[in-house]
Curated annotation (Swiss-Prot):
Organism: Ateles geoffroyi (Black-handed spider monkey)
Keywords linked to the UniProt accession: Acetylation, Heme, Iron, Metal-binding, Oxygen transport, Phosphoprotein, S-nitrosylation, Transport
GO molecular-function term, one example from the UniProt record: heme binding
Protein name: Hemoglobin subunit beta
Modification Phosphoserine occurs at: 45
PROSITE patterns xref list: GLOBIN (PS01033)
Subunit comment: Heterotetramer of two alpha chains and two beta chains.
Amino acid sequence: MVHLTGEEKAAVTALWGKVNVDEVGGEALGRLLVVYPWTQRFFESFGDLSTPDAVMSNPKVKAHGKKVLGAFSDGLAHLDNLKGTFAQLSELHCDKLHVDPENFRLLGNVLVCVLAHHFGKEFTPQLQAAYQKVVAGVANALAHKYH
């Protein structure tokens, strides 16, 4: 559960309505793989990840980034039940994929950076603070199965 004020929730929802999930998802996942290269080990089947340009232009990275942000969108629609919303993904990432749950926090922080880049001055410090709460809540929900 994420504790947002009514104003924060409205601002988060309003901005998210402007997000191009295809573009932002691919960029966020791509940046995660470039900035934290050890995360690439979970994506060995994606082909060429040998350079930042290769990562950022990789169609499988873009497609999976879109999928990730689709799940994030579901989370935004269920902020009062993030653990329930992400229960299956938490189980998959823990039991089958063995993803270090710290990676969820890293991806959330990268997503906030990408949103700031895309929205510039519209992404105010107050909106950033609200999004940090959301990505922390999502990361916590995804890590729930690990506890």
